[in-house]
């Protein structure tokens, strides 16, 4: 289906149900700030789960958020090959392995994922990792289902940094009227 066939999709954004938008914002503000797991790892996990799920919109958002956190473009690009990249520690790889598996389907997660996680993380930290993956799954499904038109700042970043590793905006392009006006950080939905 061509992007132009998603007529009126901007009318399906969460802000048209203000109570839902506010509750989702509360959840984002609870899950994403650093606690036992820092913000960078949380955004790496979110972006990895979005890569596995195939939501191009969330891939651009997660990557742009990593950029806003000061993560080098090379590390963001290396997420596409994290298993062999020297940019990532064994602890990060364990978290990203879970994110990729759960991002595909929870049924893909294996006991070995938890064996590796427990080498690096406490139970509380693993719960945080799971929360990021679960919230990411909700956002992936919402945004990919309605083919959200990605904001320009995220698109500009993704075109520059992600396109060289195979990213494209897919169905998440459209008219200026349909386009989101900014990244969630810009709107205060989530803190940097």
PLM region descriptions:
Residues 1-192:
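Hydrophobic alpha-helical segments
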């Amino acid at each position: 289906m061509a992007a132009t066939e998603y007529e009126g999709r901007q009318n399906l954004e969460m802000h048209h149900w203000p109570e839902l938008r506010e509750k989702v914002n509360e959840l984002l503000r609870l899950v994403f700030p650093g606690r036992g797991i820092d913000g960078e790892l949380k955004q790496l996990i979110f972006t990895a789960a979005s890569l596995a799920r195939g939501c191009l919109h969330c891939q651009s958002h997660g990557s742009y958020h990593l950029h806003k956190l000061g993560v080098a473009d090379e590390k963001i690009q290396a997420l596409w090959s994290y298993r062999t990249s020297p940019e990532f520690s064994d602890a990060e790889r364990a978290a990203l392995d879970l994110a990729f598996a759960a991002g595909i389907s929870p049924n893909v997660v294996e006991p070995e994922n938890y064996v590796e996680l427990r080498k690096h993380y406490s139970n509380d930290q693993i719960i945080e990792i799971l929360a990021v993956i679960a919230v990411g799954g909700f956002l992936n499904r919402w945004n990919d289902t309605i083919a959200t038109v990605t904001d320009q700042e995220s698109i500009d970043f993704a075109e520059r940094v992600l396109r060289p590793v195979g990213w494209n905006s897919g169905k998440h392009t459209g008219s200026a009227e349909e386009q989101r006006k900014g990244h969630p950080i810009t709107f205060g939905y989530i803190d940097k």
